Amino acid sequence: MADYSTVPPPSSGSAGGGGGGGGGGGVNDAFKDALQRARQIAAKIGGDAGTSLNSNDYGYGGQKRPLEDGDQPDAKKVAPQNDSFGTQLPPMHQQQSRSVMTEEYKVPDGMVGFIIGRGGEQISRIQQESGCKIQIAPDSGGLPERSCMLTGTPESVQSAKRLLDQIVEKGRPAPGFHHGDGPGNAVQEIMIPASKAGLVIGKGGETIKQLQERAGVKMVMIQDGPQNTGADKPLRITGDPYKVQQAKEMVLELIRDQGGFREVRNEYGSRIGGNEGIDVPIPRFAVGIVIGRNGEMIKKIQNDAGVRIQFKPDDGTTPERIAQITGPPDRCQHAAEIITDLLRSVQAGNPGGPGPGGRGRGRGQGNWNMGPPGGLQEFNFIVPTGKTGLIIGKGGETIKSISQQSGARIELQRNPPPNADPNMKLFTIRGTPQQIDYARQLIEEKIGGPVNPLGPPVPHGPHGVPGPHGPPGPPGPGTPMGPYNPAPYNPGPPGPAPHGPPAPYAPQGWGNAYPHWQQQAPPDPAKAGTDPNSAAWAAYYAHYYQQQAQPPPAAPAGAPTTTQTNGQGDQQNPAPAGQVDYTKAWEEYYKKMGQAVPAPTGAPPGGQPDYSAAWAEYYRQQAAYYAQTSPQGMPQHPPAPQGQ
């Protein structure tokens, strides 16, 4: 600071010396006072500056002291210089900044949505797992690939590439997958089993609508027509590739969780759950046997074997239906064996034995309708056309209910022959005798009266009793079991084979027929080589004469289809040794046959058709037939009753 003590005082004037001296002393005092105050101010200013500069006394300040100015010991002053971690921090930071890299990576443009995911979930997961930052270009510029910028260490960039490749490979179009017309749209078709198409669609289409809303795609179930053909149906999914893939997984999950049995009882077997399936063909009319009354039999098989059994839908034109068994292979095989044993026990109850008695059925081949009482049988009946609706019901509910209650299968023959009466409809009941009786009872309750039985009208050859229209009795001996071959409907006059009038359905008579069948004596050895059906004829007449309360002929050995005469063709002569006279049997047969013949044309009762001409032609054919099959002629039959 300036030293004001060297400043000379101001000079005084010469005039008024004494007074001037007194005035000069007053000025000096004022100057001294001002100088003193200036010094005090300067001292005060200098003291504040010294205090701020000496801020180290308070432990803080605006400027750090050099390490050398510190009052610490020398050992502590040297320690930071020997710290290896501290000395390495700057190089590590510089190395890290040098290792971060940015690389451009191309991905398919159609897979961008799949990579990003809903709400960015997929790309966030990739960045978190790889530690790499991913930036996708907003568009591809019309190119098939889009650029992605990957930023991170070389390891993280490689990890991100690997994850991206996995996602692209997973979302790569599968068979049936193609890009749609719209930008970024894709179409994929997956096959839905026919039995689960309704599950995917839902009631009124609600399920498929919910799937479309949840996945944000469009779904269409493709089928050729409204009829159910039993074939798998393609489900077409259209939308963003990622959403299409999600929708596909949702559909498969729906089928897995709700469409069938989980674990060992998975509905689709190897298609989804890894289980396998077996298809077992079942004769159409035997489906009711496998299902059982109210489904009891099929439930028992499923529970015992631990599988799922379903009948595949079909168009009803094949003679068999396919039972699909799904589950583990060993259990599927076990269930198939159970079903096969069930059918075999019903079919082969008495292999080669007689067919059901009481219906005059004499087939020369084995079939499902042959076997002891309790096996599968068939009963045909006709009802007026006006009462058909009472049996079928609205939407088939009545006939389904009767079938479920009785366990029998009931069918309306929809393709009658041209000569059928248009005012009558033919129904067929198939099942066990008990099931048929119960179904017949339920049907009669529905129509308010008895049904009109109709024997199976298929003509047969010489092996058997006089055809399906003969009097009640066991048919000719059957051969080993043959394929199921239902007889066609033919209500017209019988064919060239010998037939009699229709016989009433009498299932209760079957039990009485078999003892006589088994008790008959073997035929004459001399005739055994020429007539293989002699035993059948013997049983027939034994049963027939027992029903008529007449003694059966002694030692029967032949049938009318073979040489039965005395060698002269004359009924008046006694039969030679070893021959049997069946005159009485034929008389009784034609008496019964005549009772069933319609009235003459002149007065048809109740408008019934007159079959006199048909019966006359039938007798002529019968005579010609026996003349051909019998080398010595046939017995002379009594004249036909009046009106024939």
Swiss-Prot record:
PTM remark: Ubiquitinated. This targets the protein for proteasome-mediated degradation.
Entry keyword set: Acetylation, DNA-binding, Methylation, Nucleus, Phosphoprotein, Repeat, Transcription, Transcription regulation, Ubl conjugation
N-acetylalanine: residues carrying this PTM: A2
Subcellular location: Nucleus
Biased composition (Polar residues): 81-94
Biased composition (Basic and acidic residues): 65-77
Amino acid composition bias (Gly residues), ranges on this chain: 14-27, 350-365
MF (Gene Ontology): mRNA binding; RNA binding; single-stranded DNA binding
UniProt cross-references to Pfam families, sorted A to Z: FUBP_C, KH_1
Feature: compositional bias, Pro residues: 468-505
Residue ranges with Low complexity bias: 556-573
Matches recorded under CDD domains: KH-I_FUBP1_rpt1, KH-I_FUBP1_rpt2, KH-I_FUBP1_rpt3, KH-I_FUBP1_rpt4
Modified residues annotated as Phosphoserine in this record: S52, S55, S140, S630
Domain KH: residue ranges: 100-164, 185-251, 275-339, 376-443
Gene Ontology biological process: positive regulation of gene expression; regulation of transcription by RNA polymerase II
PTM sites of type Phosphothreonine: T153, T432
InterPro entries from the UniProt entry: FUBP_C, KH-I_FUBP1_dom1, KH-I_FUBP1_dom2, KH-I_FUBP1_dom3, KH-I_FUBP1_dom4, KH_dom, KH_dom_type_1, KH_dom_type_1_sf
Keyword flag Repeat: yes
Keyword field contains Phosphoprotein: yes
GO cellular component: cytoplasm; nucleoplasm; nucleus
Residue ranges of the region described as Disordered: 1-31, 44-94, 346-365, 447-532, 548-580
Record PTM Omega-N-methylarginine, positions in chain: R321, R359, R361, R363
Subunit structure: Found in a complex with PUF60 and far upstream element (FUSE) DNA segment. Interacts with PUF60 and JTV1.
Role: Regulates MYC expression by binding to a single-stranded far-upstream element (FUSE) upstream of the MYC promoter. May act both as activator and repressor of transcription.
The name this protein goes by in its record: Far upstream element-binding protein 1
Organism for this UniProt entry: Homo sapiens (Human)
